[in-house]
Amino acid sequence: MIKQITEFEDKQRTRKLYQEAFDDPEIFVDYYYSDKCLDNKMIVSEEDGEVISMLHLNPFCVNLCGTAVKSYYVVAVATTKERRHQGHMSRIFEEAFRILKEEKIPFVFLLPVEESIYSWMGFEKICDFVTDRIPDYEKIKETFDVYCIRDDVYIRRMNKEDYFRSMDNGEVLPNNPVIMAKITDPEAFNAATGQSFSSEKEALSWLKQKKIYICEEV
């Protein structure tokens, strides 16, 4: 059964799969499930009450060429070893895209281990993932067209994750990380940008030409 999880306590049931699938340090996983899971969404596939496949949608407010829009960072995409290659992930993404369109989310982004895993679903590389952070937020706002807006929650989490990285206990990243994006509601994207793109691909081509800053802070 495919379902959306929004309740904090219910989200804890996905931790087992998270730790099976990813090599993040225990201290980071503790932080993720106590803090990041306060306001994110999860789309899961369950069998007999057990989560066998999942993805997480972590919310961010993004400056999209002068317009503040809600977006999601797609993370923790995983399926149990025994149930891979059975279509669970395809169905989870299908449900996620339905929810995102219903919510009128212009686009979402992710950091892939391999681009080919997501390209067939309409995700395309839009920029490199920045590992050397620009500390001056004003400079970011002056220089870039697309970036995450730093509200109080963002700053608190950024500082917490800085601490983990300083202790070498941060999230494990792939080599040469990139950011991929997908247009999830073309009408909302056109409204936010003042454009009139007729296809997702056309909108992504336009987005790729912009100066985009997405850093370890996510």
Pin down the residues of each PLM region.
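Amide-forming acyltransferase catalytic core, primarily the GNAT-like/NAT-type
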Residues: 101, 123-181
